[in-house]
Amino acid sequence: MSGTLVRMAGPTVVAEGLAGASLNEVVRVGEERLLGEIIRIEGDRATIQVYEETAGLALGEPVEASGEPLAVELGPGLLGSVFDGVQRPLSELAAREGDFLGRGASLPALDRARAWEFEPAVAPGDRVEGGVRLGVARAPGAPDHPVVVPPGVAGRVAEVRAGARRVEEPAVLLEGGATLALLERWPVRRPRPARRRLPPDVPFLTGQRVLDCFFPVSAGGTAVVPGGFGTGKTVLEQSLAKWAAADVVVYVGCGERGNEMSEVLDEFPRLEDPRTGGPLLARTVMIVNTSNMPVAAREASIYTGAAIAEYFRDMGRSVALMIDSTSRWAEALREISARLEEMPGEEGYPTYLASRLARFYERAGRVETLGGAEGAVTMVGAVSPPGGDLSEPVTQCSLRATGALWALSADLAHRRHYPAVDWSVSFTLEGDRLAGWFEREAGDGFGALRDEARKLLQRERELAEVAELVGTESLQDAERLVLESARLLREGFLRQSALDPADATCPPAKAFEMLRLFLEWHRRAGAAIGAGVPLRSILDTGLGARLLRLGQLPAAEVPAAAAALRADLSEALARMEAE
C-alpha cells in the first residue's frame, strides 16, 4: 500500500491514500525511504512521525506502508551491541557510512552473516509453547544465549536442525509448517506477556549503602533519579550497572548531549565486570539517541529498551533498565504533540504525559515467565529537572508512577559527597515490603537501626540551624555529640568511593554491621556524657577515625574489625567513667 505526502511540519508529515493502514504501522517516506511510524489516522490520511531528518522532502513524494508495527529484532548478538533509538546498529553503520549517518541508512540489527552453534534442548515429538527453551546458541567470544519460543507460538516439534545456524535460518520446524529461528521480532510498544506477577518482596541490591539501607527498591521495581547538572547521575548509573544484582543491563541514553554519550561509550567498554573479570559491555545493551538525532526516534528509544529488557527477562534473568533521561523523552513527546496541534498541558507538555509514563513504568516487574522461570525488569529513570526544580511536571508524573525517589543534591555533590543522594528528600514506598528480607539476610533488627539512623540525621538538621545562629561551642555536649555522630554516619556510612575496590560495593551484611557499630558508638558515648565524661575526651580517643575507615575494609574483615573497635570503645569509656 502506498500514498503521497500532502503536508510536512518538522519530523511530522501527513500522507493521504493510506486508508487501510494501521496505527503504529511502519512506513517508508519519500524517495530516500526514510523510516517513520503512523501515529494518527483520519480517513485515508495518516499522520506519520519520521525517525530521520525530513529536510529536503517534497510534497507528492511516495509513502509506502509496510503492514508491520515498529518492532525490534531479538536474538543472539544483542549483548555488547550499541544501537540507536530504532535499533540500527551504530558500529556497523559507522564502518559503512562514516561518523555521520546518511538519510535512509539501514542495516539489520543483528549480524546476518555470523554463525551460531545451536545446541537443542528439544526433540521431534515434543510439544512446545511460548516461553519453552528450545536450546542454547553459542559462538566464540560471546556468552551462551538461550533460545526460547516466542509468546503466542505453540505446536509439536517436527524437526530439529542442530549445528551452525545463522540467526534467520530455521532451527526448529513445527508440525504444520511453522519454523522457529534464533531470531524473533517483537513490537516495541506491546509488553511481552508473563504467566503471573510475583510479589515485590526481594530487593534489587545496588551495592550502594544509602540506597540499599535507606531507600531500597524491589527486584522488578521502579525508581526515579532526579538531579541537576553535575550531581553525579551518570556516575551513579555506571556504579549501578557495575555492581547491582542484575544479569543484564540495558542502558538507554535518551536525548542527552552528544559529548556526554560519547564519554559513556568511551568509558563503558573499559569498565571491568566484577563478576567475570571481562568488559562490562559484554552483558550490556546500549541504546544511544543523542539530542542532535531526530526527536521522533528519541520518543521510540525507551520502548526499544523495554522490549529488549523483557526479552532477557523471559529467559529467567534479572535485568536493569536505565533511562538517561526521561526528561528528554518527555521533551520529544511535547514537540511531537505541538506538531500535531494537540491541547497543551502544564508547561506545554501533552495532557497524557502522566498516563504515558505510567504505562511505560508498568512494564517493570518481577514475574514468572511463560516457561516457568523467574525473571525481573527493574527500571531506574534519571530525570533532569531545569534548575533542580522537583515540582516540574516530568518529575511529578514520574513520582506518581514509581516506587522510589533517589533525589540527587547539588549541595552534596559540591561537597564531594557521592553518591549525592539527599536523604532528607528521597523516599521509598517498598521499605515495609522488603523489611522481612533484610531482617533475614542482613541481620535481626535491621529496620530498627535504619529508623534510628534516620532520626539521628533529622536531629542533626534541626541542631545545624541552631548552631549556625549561636555557634557550635554554645551547644551542650549531648547536642554536639549528635552533630559529631551524624557527621561520622554521613562520611563513613552514607558516602562511598566508586574508585575504592572494597568500598565501591557493600553487601547488606557488611552494611548492617557498620550501621550497628556507628549507632552503638553514638548511644554509648551519649551514656558516658550523661555520666559526666566530657565530649572532648571521647573524641580524643581516635575511635571516630577508625569508624570512618570501616567501609574501606573487605566485607570478610569487617566483623573482626568491628569486634576489636567495640572492645576498645568499652575499655576507653570505662576508664574515663572511672576517672
Swiss-Prot record:
Residues binding ATP: 227-234
The EC number(s) this enzyme carries = 7.1.2.2
Q: Enumerate the UniProt keywords alphabetically.
A: ATP synthesis, ATP-binding, Hydrogen ion transport, Ion transport, Nucleotide-binding, Translocase, Transport
Q: Which GO terms describe its molecular function?
A: ATP binding; proton-transporting ATP synthase activity, rotational mechanism; proton-transporting ATPase activity, rotational mechanism
Which biological process terms from the Gene Ontology are attached to this UniProt entry?
proton motive force-driven plasma membrane ATP synthesis
Ion transport keyword on record? yes
- Please tell me one Gene Ontology term that the record gives under cellular component: proton-transporting ATP synthase complex
Name the reaction it catalyses: ATP + H2O + 4 H(+)(in) = ADP + phosphate + 5 H(+)(out)
Q: Which domain of life is it from?
A: Bacteria
Cross-referenced Pfam families:
ATP-synt_ab, ATP-synt_ab_N, ATP-synt_ab_Xtn, ATP-synt_VA_C
- Report the family membership: Belongs to the ATPase alpha/beta chains family.
Known PANTHER family for this protein?
H(+)-TRANSPORTING TWO-SECTOR ATPASE (PTHR43607:SF1), V-TYPE PROTON ATPASE CATALYTIC SUBUNIT A (PTHR43607)
Its function, per the record, reads: Produces ATP from ADP in the presence of a proton gradient across the membrane. The V-type alpha chain is a catalytic subunit.
Q: What is this protein called in UniProt?
A: V-type ATP synthase alpha chain
**Which organism encodes this protein?**
Anaeromyxobacter dehalogenans (strain 2CP-C)
Q: Which gene encodes it?
A: atpA
